[in-house]
């Protein structure tokens, strides 16, 4: 291996990406990707050998490849002896001309990935051009991160019950049909000492 000490989530994400490049979307890949998309509160970076862990790594590696130069960017990442987020930050900081800016810190890169996997927009960093993500999770298609909750009725205050979230995981909510009044959001953590972002 060119980088024998790389973190497993990157190795397995690259392995699933190689399978995609060789065989296209298979039942195994949709199973991996959709397991995470349906449970995106699971960490992209913490490896617990769950099916969703493979899918998280695959989607993140596909995002990096799409935005930072394709196969050559993944070759650069694999050859980099730094591991994990450090190698990814190096790649993003030294992206080839024509790459889509996605940030240069893991926090910024992950925030842009979060938007891309949640909405799959055609705009810059906020979608995938190398995958066609479907709204619903069905076996033949790779789906977007599924909403953790939604609200389209504004008669009463809306709350979401306890939502667990691992570090480097995602929770996505949809709000629509509001009055145009400011939206106030309050999150109450059960653990302290962690950073998070509302996008």
Whereabouts are the PLM-identified features?
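Beta/coil-rich, acidic/histidine-enriched accessory regions frequently appended to metallopeptidases
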Residues: 83-199
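A residue-identity detector for tryptophan
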Residues: 9, 36, 46-47, 154, ...
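Acidic, low-complexity intrinsically disordered regions
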Residues: 5, 32, 42-43, 150, ...
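Short, isolated positions within intrinsically disordered regulatory regions of eukaryotic proteins
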Residues: 13, 40, 50-51, 158, ...
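Zinc-dependent metallopeptidase catalytic helix centered on the HExxH motif
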Residues: 1-37
């Amino acid at each position: 291996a060119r980088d024998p000490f790389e973190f497993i989530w990157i190795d397995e994400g690259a392995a699933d990406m190689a399978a995609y490049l060789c065989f296209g979307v298979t039942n195994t890949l949709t199973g991996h990707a959709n397991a995470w998309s349906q449970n995106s509160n699971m960490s992209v970076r913490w490896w617990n050998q769950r099916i969703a862990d493979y899918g998280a790594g695959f989607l993140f590696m596909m995002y990096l490849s799409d935005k930072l130069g394709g196969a050559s960017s993944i070759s650069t990442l694999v050859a980099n002896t730094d591991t994990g987020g450090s190698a990814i930050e190096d790649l993003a900081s030294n992206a080839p001309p024509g790459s889509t800016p996605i940030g240069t810190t893991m926090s910024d890169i992950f925030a842009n990935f979060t938007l891309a996997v949640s909405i799959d927009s055609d705009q810059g960093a906020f979608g995938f051009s190398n995958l066609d993500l479907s709204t619903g999770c069905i076996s033949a298609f790779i789906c977007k991160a599924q909403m953790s909750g939604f609200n389209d009725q504004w008669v009463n205050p809306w709350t979401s019950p306890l939502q667990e979230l691992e570090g480097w995981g995602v929770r996505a909510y949809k709000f629509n049909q509001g009055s145009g009044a400011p939206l106030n959001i309050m999150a109450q953590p059960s653990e302290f000492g962690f950073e998070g972002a509302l996008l």
